């Protein structure tokens, strides 16, 4: 019998992030507590989002609104990294980045976790920015998925190509 396998990746659907950003922008434009604060949210480059407002409290509230929209669109909070508010003239600015991909240190940490705590006979190989996990038994692969979901890793993981 052939080995079963799946890939562990960290990818974010940019269209879903764009939808969350547009929903947040619409809410910021219509909500009563944001009236007159010149609160904006926009893309700055491919993976950077910038939020601006007239006060520090309003920009923090705008970040919370955006995070709420991300969660509603099934995007993990581990994929969005927001900085502290920075004064910028008469406004405050927060830049946040969308994190994608598994770094080599994170990949080593994940494969070590699978080797140490996962079922016997499970192999994990690093392939670029993804990890291929293979085993003879599908039940072992499901146990590895449960292990990784329960682990406190600082990266949003998705499981794809389950065969």
Curated annotation (Swiss-Prot):
InterPro entries: DUF520 (IPR007551), UPF0234-like_C (IPR035571), UPF0234_N (IPR035570), YajQ-like_sf (IPR036183). Gene3D superfamilies: 3.30.70.860, YajQ-like, domain 2 (3.30.70.990). GO terms for cellular component: cytosol. One of its GO terms (molecular function) is nucleotide binding. Keywords: Nucleotide-binding. Pfam families: DUF520. Nucleotide-binding protein. Belongs to the YajQ family. This is Nucleotide-binding protein MSMEG_1165. The lineage of its organism: Bacteria, Bacillati, Actinomycetota, Actinomycetes, Mycobacteriales.
